[in-house]
């Protein structure tokens, strides 16, 4: 027979786990909110695209899980379709290659936590201010790279590396200074070529970031993920 002390201890552990999970996602069912706001799970459009949401882990620049149990990448439907088209073309290039998504639609609450982390540091230039929302906060941006047989290919720097090596506006200089390899440059160019062909634009400080729509247009016409 299980003693009452064991039962009490087990109950405490369960309550702690529930609190941790609730704290991580602010008590909000993020997947349900994404759907409520009209976004779609990329896996329902193309299940071959890999997803590894870095802000659903603790190994990120904030140092905490900001997405709780959310593991799916959500976008506006037209963005998801464009990514599926990129994936098809990438597979035509080499069947062993695949897109991998590191971040997708991002709640405004997560944007606030990111901003709070960097606002008093030089790294604030890498993070959009949360009060009006950036492209991620409207479901129209993606942080993405390429894997070969499930292994990330060389892009010259890690995702979310806050350094000039992540910038794309002077890659010839990075190559000349041997800060990136020719292979890494070729890989970046492949990703950019495929993404641009589907209407995505780049952000000069992050090789992994792509977006669609002017941000002012998005603020007028799309719903901010204000949760």
What are these regions (language model features)?
Residues 210:
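Conserved metal-phosphate-binding beta-hairpin within the catalytic cores
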Residues 107:
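Segments that shape or occlude catalytic/ligand-binding pockets
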Residues 110:
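Short, well-ordered surface patches within globular domains
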Residues 1-10:
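Bacterial N-terminal signal peptides that target proteins for export
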Residues 23-104, 114-205, 214-227:
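Extracytoplasmic cell-surface/polysaccharide-interacting catalytic and binding patches
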